[in-house]
Amino acid sequence: MLWTYDMMSFQKIYSPTQLANAMKLVRQQNGWTQSELAKKIGIKQATISNFENNPDNTSLTTFFKILQSLELSMTLCDAKNASPEAAEQQDLEW
């Protein structure tokens, strides 16, 4: 499970599709097209489209390039004790 930060709230992420949708929303909120984001990180627009529409086949390398270009980070939490507060505390400990 992964928490994403969206509009002052945390969202639990349970699937690659949810993750891709959350990252697509961030891209759109920043006013970037798929082409603009792809150019920013040196990949093809089709690669961004494939990630947003079929994230199961995206390599981890591509995923992290997109994540970094969107100025996002990822925090892993113990699913049994997951909460926004736990995620923030874990982030503070690093």
Swiss-Prot record:
GO molecular function terms attached to this record: DNA binding
Protein name per the record: Antitoxin HipB
Upper taxonomic lineage: Bacteria, Pseudomonadati, Pseudomonadota, Gammaproteobacteria, Enterobacterales
Pfam family membership, one: HTH_3
Superkingdom field: Bacteria
Residue span, HTH cro/C1-type domain: 23-77
Species whose genome carries this gene: Escherichia coli O6:H1 (strain CFT073 / ATCC 700928 / UPEC)
Stored SMART domains: HTH_XRE
Zinc-finger as UniProt keyword: no
Subunit (UniProt): Homodimer. Forms a HipA(2)HipB(2) heterotetramer which can interact with DNA. This complex also blocks the toxic activity of HipA.
DNA-binding segment(s): 34-53
KO phenotype (gene knockout): Deletion of the hipB-hipA operon has no effect on virulence in mouse infection; the disrupted strain is as virulent as wild-type.
Residue ranges of the TM segments: none
Ribosomal protein recorded as keyword: no
Function: Antitoxin component of a type II type II toxin-antitoxin (TA) system. Neutralizes the toxic effect of cognate toxin HipA. Represses the hipBA operon promoter.
Keywords assigned: DNA-binding, Repressor, Toxin-antitoxin system, Transcription, Transcription regulation
